Amino acid sequence: MLNFTLRSFAIIVTSLAAAGTLAQSYPSQPVRIVIGFPPGGTTDVIGRLVAQGLAESLGKSFIVDNRGGASGTIGTAIVAKAEPTGYTLTVVSSTHGTAPALYSSLPYQEKDLAPAGLIATTPYVFVVHPTIPANTFQELLALLRQSPGKYSFASSSPGTAQHLGGELVKRMASVDMVHVPYKGTGVLLPDLLSGRVPMMFENVAIMTPHIRKGSLRPLAVSSAKRTPLLPDVPTVAESGLGGFEVLGWFALLAPAGTPPPVIKMLNAEVNKLIVKPSVVERFAALGAEPLGGTPERTAAFIRNEQEKWGKVIRDSGIKAD
């Protein structure tokens, strides 16, 4: 028993020493950041900003690897199963908060991941086609109450923030509108702009050009406060649904077991990066705002999102598979 105890103690000491050495030399080789979505989307843009910033501050390449599919869960699973050395990371989006309730099974568990930092949030804006006879969100709710089930709203796929935002409006306002899911924002835009599906929540940066052209009318934004991109558009909460908040968000995760000093370093670098003026300016163009905070805050934030949307998804009977 004594020999076993001494061996166990020696293993622990050796492991701690190795972790300390790794942290001191990290990164000594290129780091891969897996993005669970195709190039060009908001998650990809945010991920590339983080990769570029970390490469500049830490002096090694941070290479983006796009592995799209299943609302980002395929990419997340790659990282969850990677060696916990800090050389395989992922930037996840708010779909990470909905996936556990949306899918009957996932190729990873939350305990397989180590939160490293919160990056940013992005609001959504509820837009309607100009043919909809409503100039305010309150007028829209009155219209929906007068004609339950008559009007439809679009989303880029089931379980996304666009979809769940609509479901939350239905629950909080006691209105009925029909969900029409698509396979991506690019696919749904022609129908939205033509009025075939006349309303939806969508990323504010994506919708702003169409709003400025007069092709779509903004009624409310989904964040708790107004967005600088559309300062005259009230929030949903201001418009009668107090407490309403739906945000896109992005976080940096590593495999569970990544040495704490490496997590601490990544967290510090992310917190410094997201307040740099050049990054804040890029965020502003996306309608995004820096988040930041400790790894513990990141874990609590993700847990709260999963609990909040898990209830909405289960109560609404939404499934992605």
Label for each model-derived stretch:
Residues 95-103, 163, 170-172, 199-233:
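A ligand-binding cleft/hinge motif common to bilobed small-molecule-binding domains
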Residues 28-30, 172-175, 212, 235, ...:
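An extracytoplasmic/periplasmic, membrane-proximal ligand-sensing/linker region
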Residues 45, 49, 53, 74, ...:
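Extracytoplasmic/secreted proteins, especially bacterial periplasmic and envelope-associated proteins
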Residues 18-20:
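N-terminal signal peptide c-region/cleavage motif recognized by signal peptidases
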Residues 81-87, 101-187, 236-238, 249-282:
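Hinge/capping helix and adjacent helix->loop/strand transition within the periplasmic-binding protein
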Residues 23-112, 150-152, 174-203, 210, ...:
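N-terminal (or domain-start) structured segment
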Residues 1-12:
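Bacterial N-terminal signal peptides that target proteins for export
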